Amino acid sequence: MIRTMLQGKLHRVKVTQADLHYEGSCAIDQDFLDAAGILENEAIDIWNVSNGKRFSTYAIAAERGSKIISVNGAAAHCASVGDIVIIASFVTMSDEEARTWHPNVAYFEGDNEMKRTAKAIPVQVA
């Protein structure tokens, strides 16, 4: 059996640019890509916490240390500057691999300040 698992996640980053006329994609600070293990040109899903929209695109690198999250092209209709989003990538693997898999998660606050990274998502309690 093949399973699709969360590979990397940028949790609650703030959109810094939305450029409708750029070629497409989402430009992401290279430091953020590294923290989540997301590669340039990799497919990503973006979930907009601010407006509930969910969409797919691909990642491109923004300048390291810039804190840029730029939603580009048609996707700019789905996010505005200041929106809080979650960016995720996924990987497929065998059932056996999936049982010991741990995603790369980076947590953000404020103006895209990375607060911590983790190799798991906390258990939700009642």
UniProtKB/Swiss-Prot annotation:
GO terms for biological process: alanine biosynthetic process; pantothenate biosynthetic process. Its cofactor is pyruvate. Its EC number is 4.1.1.11. It is found in: Cytoplasm. The modification Pyruvic acid (Ser) is found at residue 25. It is an enzyme of class 4 (lyase). Keywords: Autocatalytic cleavage, Cytoplasm, Decarboxylase, Lyase, Pantothenate biosynthesis, Pyruvate, Schiff base, Zymogen. Is synthesized initially as an inactive proenzyme, which is activated by self-cleavage at a specific serine bond to produce a beta-subunit with a hydroxyl group at its C-terminus and an alpha-subunit with a pyruvoyl group at its N-terminus. Pathway: Cofactor biosynthesis; (R)-pantothenate biosynthesis; beta-alanine from L-aspartate: step 1/1. Substrate binds at residues 57, 73-75. CDD domains: Asp_decarbox. It catalyses: L-aspartate + H(+) = beta-alanine + CO2. One of its GO terms (molecular function) is aspartate 1-decarboxylase activity. The active site is at 25 (schiff-base intermediate with substrate), 58 (proton donor). Binds 1 pyruvoyl group covalently per subunit. Coiled coil: none annotated. GO terms for cellular component: cytosol. NCBIfam families: panD. Heterooctamer of four alpha and four beta subunits. Catalyzes the pyruvoyl-dependent decarboxylation of aspartate to produce beta-alanine. This is Aspartate 1-decarboxylase. It comes from Salmonella arizonae (strain ATCC BAA-731 / CDC346-86 / RSK2980). The lineage of its organism: Bacteria, Pseudomonadati, Pseudomonadota, Gammaproteobacteria, Enterobacterales.
